[in-house]
Amino acid sequence: MSYSLIGKEHISEPTIIRLKHLAEKIVIVDGQPGCGKTMFSTIISAMDRVEMLTYAFEIEFVCRLFHLKKMKKDAAIAMVRMFTDHKLYQMMMSRETNFRYSDLSSVFKAADPWRYLKRIFQEGDMVIPERIKNQNPILSLTTHDLLSVSKPVFEGLENRVVFIEIVRHPLYMLIQQTLNYERLLSDPRDVQINIKHGDDELPYYAYQWEKLFISCNAVERAIYTMDNTIRLTNKTKMEMR
């Protein structure tokens, strides 16, 4: 005798959701390369109840895929909520916390390294939700060029998120962007959302100006990228008001 679990009134296309949450407050420090966001993140993380800075590459990837229409809105919003909660959950017991001494995001660069060293030996897992409730920590995330594609963040986290955009004189950012193009574009260490253009692999931000991107040198690419990012950022600000 055989039967099917799929009945006549099943969901044909599921909506991805996450309604509950652990992180009550999230602060995101964002900006273009060379703007000084890591320095500001370190200062902000020294404030009361704010956790040490952590990079949020997963959230960046989700938002970029959504921007490229490669991920549906419900999935993008749910994943932003999942990643913020998961990061705080792990951090509250120093799981996946960076102990590499020289890194900018290292425990040893934090205002209170001992807090994270103690967590290694404390009880974890089941007690973490209650610890979060009692201590009310603020998750501190540092991101790269996120504001320009940040709709899933604002819609997913709503009034739980504080978004800080770091802006610097464009000359210094241009220098850093140019260096990135000279050193990182063909480097397999640069884990990025890329798009296919003919036989070429281009960064996601070259979308809709691929031919121009290919024809430019490193300095020109940096200028066009900065301009395009600023335009997208301003558009997002207007739409999210």
Residue ranges of predicted features:
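N-terminal pre-Walker A segment at the start of P-loop NTPase domains
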Residues: 1-13
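Phosphate-binding P-loop
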Residues: 17-24
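Catalytic donor-sugar/metal-binding loop of nucleotide-sugar-dependent glycosyltransferases
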Residues: 48-52, 160-163
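PAPS-dependent sulfation machinery
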Residues: 56-141, 200-205
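Hydrophobic anchor at the beta1->P-loop junction of P-loop NTPases
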Residues: 29
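PAPS-dependent sulfotransferase catalytic domain
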Residues: 129, 133-134, 138, 144-241
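A conserved segment at the C-terminal end of the G1
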Residues: 35-51
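Extracellular glycan-modifying ectodomains
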Residues: 6, 49-54, 66
